[in-house]
From Swiss-Prot:
Gene that specifies this protein: edar
Membrane topology: Single-pass type I membrane protein
Protein name as catalogued: Tumor necrosis factor receptor superfamily member EDAR
Domain Death residues, every copy: 403-476
Main location per the UniProt record: membrane
Signal peptide residue numbers: 1-27
Oxidoreductase among keywords: no
Species annotation: Oryzias latipes (Japanese rice fish)
PANTHER family tied to this protein: TNFR-CYS DOMAIN-CONTAINING PROTEIN, TUMOR NECROSIS FACTOR RECEPTOR SUPERFAMILY MEMBER EDAR
Length: 514
């Protein structure tokens, strides 16, 4: 028995000593920094070897561990690195992505630098002219007075002619091309004639199968004329002292569809202004004089019954700036006090006036100032996040941007681009885009390819998604600076019943810490 007790004591002592050694070893490894490894010879943490510019580490080193065979290897062709512990990144593709010329080609130690736009492309003047804002657009959508596009059209219209020669020789063409053009014209003419003949035959059989069509139509006309004459006779029979309320005629007028807004045919920025009008309020609060005038001219709006319209949050945000109030009471109280008309009749007669107020509030000047502020935020964010990849942002920031890019809706000018259009702007193939489910996978893919946060913002500007640019800039710069620059206005309790709440009113502390 004593022998067994001694053996048990020896085993327990051995296990306890082994646990103590493991605890000391783990404590020593955990005390090392991000780019340090634990040297068992010197029993201390040492810094990992740094690579020179144009090189990258082939193994991992840091947090107390160092892989065997750690060394610095040169960057492959088409990539660059600034040295130390940075991996090699791909050079900027000025021609394919930015549609610009190459000012300085990229080397193994620095990135490529883009120059002016390619022939047939131009750059908007109201955008920041920095390294990451060199986004050129096609001259097909350019205004008439664009200088870069004028040069291209003049070069096409006025080809160079030798002043010494007085005759212009035609271009020699092969006889085979002439015969091919003739055959193509004959084939197209034959197809066109056959199509016309088929249409005429079908129309002939349709008219032959329905011989009583004209009689039916003439009978309908006769019935309509008789109905009008009967109405006139009924009106004549009514005495003069009887008052007739034309409720049906007024109701028919109210049921008429509102006029469609005229689309702007300006440059590519007009489409973005129409998109921004869905998500912004007016930047300036109306004065008391404007409030009095709006109460006098739009007093019918105070009769809108909010209780009968739970989906009034889909109305334009222009109602927030007008603050429709009658004698200190909200619109719902006005509708309850007035019992002369039905609620459905009141609301149907006021929807068109609400849309008219919304269209008057969102003037082009407000949209331009809003666009300028967002582009200023974009330029500042590019300066702050230079060299950072998108995956270095917190997960909740990337998830919010992915949700914004996943929602697709149509505006008056164009269809809002989604993350799939963003992937196409990065040059990804459709097969690869089809394998992705959301924007988070796209952010991880472009980060692996070596693109940075400014590159991502530049693509968002290129596809006209300034709302996503504003969201990412707000997450990076923080809420205080965004409030000072953009100046959003607060909403009182009554108007909060009319507007759907925003999914993310302010960036989280994790986003603002970037």
């Amino acid at each position: 028995m004593k022998m067994w007790k001694r053996r048990g004591q020896k085993k327990s002592m051995f296990l306890s000593s082994l646990l103590v050694c493991c605890m000391f070893a783990s404590a020593e490894y955990s005390s090392c920094g991000e780019y340090e490894f634990f040297n068992q010879t010197s029993n201390s943490c040492q810094a990992c070897p740094q690579c020179r510019p144009g090189q990258e580490p082939n193994m991992s080193c840091g947090h107390g561990m160092k892989d065997e065979g750690f060394a610095c290897v040169p960057c492959p062709q088409g990539k660059y690195s600034k040295g130390k512990y940075e991996i090699c990144r791909r050079h900027k593709d000025c021609n394919a992505l930015y549609k610009a010329t190459v000012r300085e080609p990229g080397t193994a130690e620095k990135d490529a630098e883009c120059g002016p736009c390619l022939p047939g492309y131009y750059m908007l003047e109201n955008r920041a002219r920095n390294l990451y804002a060199m986004v050129c657009h096609s001259c097909q959508n350019a205004p008439l007075n664009t200088k870069e596009c004028k040069k291209t059209t003049e070069a096409i219209i006025k080809p160079p002619i030798n002043p010494g020669s007085t005759t212009v020789l035609p271009h020699p063409g092969s006889p085979g091309q002439g015969h091919l053009a003739t055959a193509l014209i004959i084939a197209m003419s034959t197809i066109f004639i056959m199509a016309i003949a088929i249409v005429l035959i079908i129309m002939f059989y349709i008219l032959k199968a329905k011989p009583n069509g004209q009689a039916c139509c003439s009978g309908q006309v006769v019935k309509a004329v008789e109905a009008q004459t009967n109405k006139l006779e009924d009106k004549k029979d009514v005495p003069d002292n009887v008052v007739i309320f034309p409720e049906k005629e007024e109701y028919d007028k109210l049921k008429a569809s509102p006029q469609k807004t005229v689309k702007s045919e300006n440059d590519a920025s007009s489409e973005n202004e129409q998109l921004l009008s869905r998500s912004i309020d007016s930047d300036e609060e109306p004065t008391s004089d404007k409030l009095r005038s709006s109460e006098a001219t739009n007093h019918n709006l105070c009769q809108a019954n909010v209780g009968y319209k739970p989906d009034l949050c889909l109305l334009s945000l222009g109602l927030l700036d007008h603050r429709v109030v009658c004698n200190g009471t909200p619109a719902s109280a006005g509708s309850q006090a007035n019992n002369t008309q039905a609620p459905n009749h009141i609301t149907s007669s006021n929807v068109s006036s609400m849309n008219a107020i919304n269209n008057n509030n969102k003037t082009p000047g407000m949209l331009q100032s809003r666009r300028k502020k967002i582009l200023d935020l974009y330029a500042r964010t590019c300066h702050v996040t230079e060299g950072l990849s998108p995956t270095e942002l917190p997960f909740d920031c990337l998830e919010k941007a992915s949700r914004m890019l996943s929602s697709s809706y149509s505006s008056d000018a164009a269809v809002v681009k989604t993350w799939r259009h963003l992937a196409e702007s990065f040059g990804l193939k459709r097969d690869e885009i089809g394998g992705m489910s959301d924007g988070l996978q796209l952010f991880e893919r472009v980060s692996t390819a070596g693109y940075s946060i400014p590159d991502l913002l530049a693509r968002l500007v290129q596809i006209e998604r300034l709302d996503a640019v504003e969201s990412l800039c707000a997450d990076v710069l923080g809420s205080n600076e965004i409030v000072a620059l953009v100046g959003r206005q607060s909403v009182n309790s009554f108007h909060s019943q009319l507007v759907c709440p925003s999914p993310c009113t302010s960036p989280s502390p994790r986003c603002a810490s970037v």
